[in-house]
Design a protein with these regions (language model features):
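Internal glycine-rich, Lys/Arg-flanked active-site/core loops of soluble domains
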Residues: 311
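Extracellular or lumenal secretory-pathway regions
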Residues: 2-307, 315-510
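Intrinsically disordered, low-complexity C-terminal regions of metazoan proteins
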Residues: 514-515
Length: 515
């Protein structure tokens, strides 16, 4: 009987140890599932941040230095069809929008230097190639446009001494310079020899080199830029990832009246700090824009199954309001609503930037000319589609119109009849339609797999843990009942049988059972 008790006790002890172990493992699985539900995406975010840092030799660095995309530039030129009538009769200028003239573009960063302080310095190199197969016309198409060098010079002379204006008129008469020129589209963009610039080149001392030898709206952009850009790599924190730190060794501009407006702390438009929300305000800096361009959330988008946020400038970005007074250092009158004066960045040429077709601008600007259709937000709005977790631009359209603010100068006979007007020259859009498949695959892997993995791990581990807990508790309870039953049975078996007294005869003697 004692052997059976020992065997039962041993069996019960082994049974209990096994299920207590199962219970411990089940609790661990449940806690792991809860941990995954709470911290898995944060850990993935930390890993992604680590991989995004621009380190030489990494995939991110290679794609940043040599982007695997082929951006494009589409140019639309406003051809003036009634230049003589406009000058002689005061007619409204009639414009014919030609284009698009399409150029494919190759981007890369060259002369990259690691400053060992969480920043890189580099030069942009851009190569443009005309694409006749995508264009509506050839880049040698002739167009009539305002003579920008001449009209810039006359507008700047408005407040000069009268004899200087008369002398300028004589020089222009000798050189046969007229307010409108006929050039090819390629010359307008990439440069042509201008008589005024040629004269200035001959007059100006050699030690005072002119900013450019030819005139072109994109002059000097086809090739390696001389500008040195310093950008944060993310090594010291992702809050400034992809943000410009210095431009030509300067941390801010010198043109505007406040530090906020002189700031250049923005992205170049290709990468942004990760973990973007709908409440984030992005900022893009471009030298030709001469300021930071703020971008705010517009709507959610989906590109090849990848979710993103579309950001666009606020409607009052070029408004004549209190917030933008810092961009008007000379004081009122400032640029009209919808225009931004970049003359301080363009050697005092009266260049005004706007969105195409004067989108978000004063309607009177478009009404001053004929031939420009009403603006369409879908065609003329600037936007960038960003993958919010990684801060990578997936699609973009930088749409800008270049205008010339002409001032009437009656003392210069060539432009005496040229009224005060904001004359549109051309507009262009630059950007990418979508990323290559290898980049999109990486984005899907980084953004779509982790949430699925988190749910699978958290729900799966938690469910398995809960089931094992229920099973272990059930078995332990049953084991406890079984042990109680065995103890009870053992107690009953060990109890001695009741004794019986021997039979006696009538005289009191015990009866012998034997015969």
């Amino acid at each position: 009987m004692q052997g059976r008790d020992k065997w039962c006790a041993k069996l019960t002890s082994a049974f209990l140890r096994k299920w207590w172990f199962v219970l411990g493992c089940a609790i661990l699985l449940l806690l792991t599932g809860i941990f995954c539900a709470i911290f898995f995406m944060k850990l993935v975010g930390l890993y992604i941040d680590h991989e995004l840092v621009l380190r030489e030799g990494s995939q991110t660095f290679d794609w940043w230095a040599h982007p695997p995309v082929r951006p494009f530039v589409q140019v639309y030129v406003y051809n003036v069809t009634n230049a003589d009538e406009f000058l002689n009769n005061g007619s409204k200028p009639v414009l014919d929008e030609l284009g698009p003239y399409v150029y494919s573009e190759e981007w890369e960063k060259v002369n990259i230097t690691d400053n060992l302080n969480g920043t890189l310095s580099f030069h942009y190199k851009r190569t443009y190639t005309f694409r006749p197969d995508l264009s509506r016309g050839l880049d040698d198409d002739a167009v009539v446009v305002p003579n920008i060098p001449m009209l810039s010079a006359t507008s700047q002379s408005k407040h000069a001494a009268r004899f200087l204006r008369l002398a300028m008129a004589s020089i222009m008469d000798i050189l046969k310079i007229k307010p409108f020129v006929e050039v090819s589209v390629g010359q307008l963009l990439w440069g042509y020899e201008d008589p005024l610039l040629k004269l200035a080149k001959d007059v100006v001392p050699k030690e005072q080199k002119l900013p450019y030898e030819e005139f072109g709206l994109f002059y000097g952009k086809n090739g390696t830029s001389p500008d040195v850009v310093t950008m944060f790599t993310g090594a010291t924190g992702m809050a400034k990832y992809g943000i410009i730190n210095r431009y030509n060794m300067k941390e801010k501009l010198q043109h505007w009246t406040t530090d906020e407006c002189n700031s250049i702390a923005g992205s170049d438009g290709s990468i942004f700090p990760p973990h973007i929300t709908k409440n984030s305000t992005l900022a893009v800096y471009d030298k030709d824009l001469c300021r930071l361009l703020p971008l705010r959330f517009l709507k959610e988008v989906s590109i090849s199954g990848i979710q993103g946020y579309r950001f666009t400038p606020p409607e009052d970005v070029f408004a004549d309001n209190e917030h933008n007074k810092c961009f008007c250092p000379a004081g009122p009158p400032c640029a009209p609503n919808g225009l931004f004066n970049v003359s301080l960045c363009q050697y005092d040429s009266p260049i005004m930037l706007s969105f195409p077709h004067f989108y978000l601008a004063d309607p009177k600007l478009r009404e001053a000319v004929e031939g420009i259709s009403p603006p369409d937000p879908e065609r003329h709005r600037l936007f960038i589609d960003v993958q919010p977790e990684m801060g990578i631009a997936m699609r973009a359209r930088a749409r800008i119109q270049i205008n010339l603010a002409v001032s009437q100068v009656v003392d210069i006979k060539q432009v005496a009849n040229f009224p005060d007007i904001v004359f549109p020259i051309l507009w262009f859009e630059e950007g990418i339609d979508e990323l290559p498949e290898q980049v999109k695959s990486l984005l899907r892997l980084a953004t779509q797999v982790p949430p699925v993995a988190r749910n699978a791990l958290s729900y799966g581990l938690s469910a398995i843990g809960i089931l094992l807990i229920l099973l272990a508790v059930t078995c332990l309870i049953r084991s406890s009942h079984r042990q109680s039953t065995l103890r009870l049975e053992g107690h009953v078996v060990a109890k001695p049988p009741p004794t019986t007294s021997p039979s006696k005869d009538s005289n009191g003697y015990e009866l012998n059972s034997r015969r």
